[in-house]
Amino acid sequence: MRGGIHLRMYATFFVPRRWRSKFVRQLDNEMETLLKNSRNAVFRLLLREASVILVGMLMVGVALLLGQQEFIFPELAALSIGCLVIVKRVWCVDRWRTVVLLTGAALLGTLLFYSSLPFIAKIALGFSSVALLLILLRSSLYPALSACLLPLVLNESSWVYPLAVFLLALLLVGMQWLMEKLRLRTALPFRPVARTVHERIIRAVYLLIVVTIVVSVAAFFEQRFFILPPLIVLFVEFSRPEAGLRKAPFLITVLMAVAALLGNFGKLFLEPFLGLSPVLSMGSVLLLLFVVFSTSKRYFAPAAAIAVLPQILQQDNWYLFPIEVTLATALFIAIALLFFRAKRTAGQN
């Protein structure tokens, strides 16, 4: 609106009198159109955010109705932000790849859960297998890593889990398709990852080494909050030298800390003290998280997964959850910034 005032002043002093009224009239029409488009954009954004909140509430509601905790899939909240709320390309993926990657990763995680391999070997095999699947499908849907590692880190799973992830993935892509049909978001064609297979394999090996070391230390000290799957996804995202997230490490750390606090707030305060059902508690937590995102002007998908996690975590050490999430976030970001930098070309100093 300030721009409109300045243009009106320009019209008053510099536009000839005979053209002035016509100029001002056109200016008012254009400003009204811009304001209307802006309001429409805000309305569409609010609808997309509301859809994520409804997905989270539906997920918890179905889990309670069926008595199957496996239907609470924290990464679905993160995926919903990337696939429904954010209009630009977040991951190199399309709908069928989304379903295949998430379902395949969940099935692999369940198989590893029932295997007799040591914990660290399960994590390493799960991480490397999903990384290979991402390479084969030329995709960058890194939240698939979380689908595989979640039952291993939490040490809880059943054969219902891959079925639940499959159904939730169908729900996600179905809502994305519907939003595109309703013009609430623009359809984006699939664009494969630009890196060569060799480059991606080398990078996956380096990532695997770091993840294995951190997992080994966390397992030794029995502090599994340090290696929650959304944190590993965060590390993989941050390890990309071209990622815009690398420009705001402090903000991302704060968002993860706030998300962890909100998750605990919902589970430990809204439900027992205010008497809210888990469904309403989940909706309230996601609503508050979107307020934080809007205030910070940054949507960060893994933070949504962190906010959902307390719904399925054992609450014996609830006070450690936000502390360890914050420390692990800072650690993973520091490692990514220090050891995963862009290669310098010959013309650079």
What are these regions (language model features)?
Residues 123-138, 147-154:
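A generic, well-ordered mixed alpha/beta core segment in the N-terminal half of proteins
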Residues 2-3:
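Extreme N-terminal basic, low-complexity initiation segments
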